[in-house]
């Protein structure tokens, strides 16, 4: 019984992690050409958003 609950929690966590990592991958993939186009990646609002979005996600896991 206890193992089943643990298994469900792990599966839930993996699914959540997969969704977030997929979102992060797509987001970084989309922002990549924009960064290159703008020249200085540090100055782009998207780059700042990138850091603001990614940092808390990495801290979560």
Swiss-Prot record:
<keyword id="KW-1133">Transmembrane helix</keyword>
<keyword id="KW-0472">Membrane</keyword>
<dbReference type="GO" id="GO:0016020">
    <property type="term" value="C:membrane"/>
</dbReference>
<protein>
    <recommendedName>
        <fullName>Uncharacterized protein 113L</fullName>
    </recommendedName>
</protein>
<keyword id="KW-0812">Transmembrane</keyword>
<feature type="transmembrane region" description="Helical">
    <location>
        <begin position="13"/>
        <end position="30"/>
    </location>
</feature>
């Amino acid at each position: 019984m206890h193992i089943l609950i643990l298994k469900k929690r792990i599966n839930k966590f993996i699914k959540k992690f997969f969704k977030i990592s997929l979102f992060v991958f797509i987001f970084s993939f989309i922002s990549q050409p924009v960064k290159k186009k703008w020249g200085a990646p540090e100055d782009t609002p998207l780059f700042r958003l990138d850091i603001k979005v990614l940092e808390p996600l990495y801290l979560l896991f």
